[in-house]
Regions:
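Short amphipathic alpha-helices and their capping/turn segments at secondary-structure boundaries
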Residues: 50, 55-71, 192-193, 251-255, ...
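Leucine-rich solenoid repeat modules
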Residues: 12, 302-306, 310-464
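Acidic-and-aromatic substrate-binding clefts and catalytic sites of carbohydrate-active enzymes
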Residues: 44-56, 182-184, 213, 245-247, ...
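Hydrophobic regular-secondary-structure patch
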Residues: 2-87, 136-158, 184, 307, ...
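Conserved beta-strand positions
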Residues: 13, 46, 74, 139, ...
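Leucine-rich repeat
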Residues: 31, 37-41, 63-71, 84-292, 305, 311-317, ...
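Structural motif corresponding to alpha-helix initiation and N-cap regions
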Residues: 6, 49-53, 59, 121, ...
Length: 464
């Protein structure tokens, strides 16, 4: 074994498919530890409790391995029973670690019992409490969670209680999703995200299904903003915030006001949740009022779902006007629904022309939810932008228009059917293409790319 070159040993390691064998290879001898530990533990993906327990077994034997972890992926988790691979001494060490992050003996005992029962969340949280050098985290939350919230909260508030939970000082990116079960996946509240906003190195948070409830206290977000200004430690270093399939009744004010350097906000609205409220464009405008000088990317939707009725009743707000973007002087990438972009109301023309709404910094405009009967108006407004490109919109490079432009199934002739399967591929109507041709010509003349999209036409939704 001593005569085998390191390159050959590493090549053998590349062919170890079983995660348990990989983690055990680190423990063979000091040479194997030096060769495999950093490469294997630096970026780790765990998909079930069995893999996690084997991983923790290696860390119990070599505690220094926990500090090697930089990228931890727990996002593709599959719940399944696991047989414990740890002996009594190893379990005792896990109990000691659980005690170090518990605030009471009762809590420690419960955590110890949950570890023995194979509670997946208890195991995941204990691993996270040891990973003190992590840079990137991808995590799927279980439907019910207690330990994870405790670990994250105590990591940023450890001074309040004598617990040893000082991790996440180097965490830069967090991707938060949810485990699927037979019923439905869970959700997160803005309060559950707040610990990530207080981690000193955090730059990017990407979360699924965040539900921000409506409240009668409209000053809560502004109070947060005032506190952040008075106490710099309340400010977050986050520059990129992405929320998918979420429902923000207050425009995320409690989060955005904590981010003085926010450069990117990507929000996908969904009315599919039990406690959903309709999209509130004016709330977002208010919450982003203090970020006009920093925002470079603003997505106020991304093929979201909007219903005429929600749990709150008739949805009267989702087609409301967002407001002028002219003062967002750093904005380069805008994605927004047509009713929120232009204040059309009950007229056929907007109250304010599009060139007066857009900032001169704009590079890309992606306009969603354009109905066919609104397309002529939108085309005329975009033509005004093209006419002003040389003087005001020199940075404009691309325009995307997404809407309801496809040929109905009953209008498709036999030539549009697949002879083998009988399926029909939806296409954009010919008259829509003809209607958009003058705009396309204008874009070509000015060096701007134009894309027509319809979410029912798969070939048009491919990102270029």
């Amino acid at each position: 074994m001593e005569n085998i070159p390191n390159d050959v040993i590493l090549l053998i390691g590349d062919h170890l498919e079983d995660r348990g064998d990989c983690y055990n290879a680190v423990l063979v001898n000091s040479r194997f530890h030096a060769l495999f530990s950093r490469a294997l533990f630096r970026s780790t993906a765990l998909k079930n409790l069995t893999q996690l327990q084997l991983f923790m077994k290696a860390i119990v034997r070599q505690p220094s391995l926990a500090s090697v972890i930089q990228c931890l992926d727990l996002s593709r988790w599959e719940s399944a029973p696991a047989q414990s691979f740890l002996d009594a001494d190893e379990l005792a060490q896990l109990s000691i670690w659980a005690k170090s992050v518990s605030r009471s003996e009762e809590e420690h005992i419960q955590w110890e019992q949950d570890l023995l029962k194979g509670n997946e969340e208890a195991w995941i949280a204990l691993l996270l409490s040891r990973a003190n050098n992590i840079r990137q985290l991808k995590l799927a939350y279980p439907r019910e969670n207690n330990y994870l919230d405790q670990i994250f909260d105590r990591a940023v508030n450890s001074g309040r209680q004598p617990v040893q939970c000082h991790g996440f000082l180097r965490l830069e990116e967090a991707y938060l999703s949810h485990m699927e079960d037979d019923e439905s996946k869970g959700s997160l509240s803005p309060a559950q995200l707040l610990p990530f906003f207080r981690m000193p190195s955090m730059r990017k948070v990407d979360a699924d299904t965040v539900i921000e409830p409506a409240t009668s206290n409209g000053d809560s977000g502004r109070e947060t903003d005032i506190q952040a200004e008075e106490d710099p430690t309340q400010c977050s270093s986050i520059t990129d915030l992405t929320l998918n399939s979420s429902n923000a009744a207050q425009g995320l004010e409690s989060l955005t006001t904590l981010c003085p350097s926010l450069k990117s906000l990507k929000y996908q609205h969904s009315d599919d949740h039990a406690l959903a409220s309709g999209f509130q464009p004016t709330s977002f405008f208010t919450s982003l009022a203090t970020r006009k000088l920093t925002l470079e990317t603003l997505w106020l939707d991304n093929l979201g779902t909007h219903h005429a009725f929600t749990a709150s009743g008739l949805n009267e707000s989702y087609d409301g006007y967002f407001g002028s973007l002219a003062d967002f002087t750093a904005l380069k990438d805008l994605r927004i629904r047509l009713p929120n972009l232009l204040d059309v109301g009950y007229t056929f023309e907007p109250s304010t022309p599009l060139p007066e709404i857009l900032p001169s910094s704009i590079e890309r405009i992606y306009i969603e939810s354009c109905k066919e009967n609104s397309l002529p108006m939108l085309i005329s407004q975009l033509q005004l932008v093209l006419e002003a490109r040389k003087e005001r919109f020199k940075a404009l490079k691309r325009v995307d228009i997404e809407g309801f432009f496809h040929v109905d199934d009953e209008d498709l002739d036999d030539s549009g059917a697949d002879g083998a399967s009988g399926t029909r591929e939806r296409v954009i109507k010919e008259r829509v293409l003809e209607m958009a041709q003058p705009l396309r010509n204008g874009c070509e003349d000015t060096g701007v790319q134009l894309y027509l999209r319809d979410r029912a036409c798969a070939q048009t939704m491919v990102e270029v």
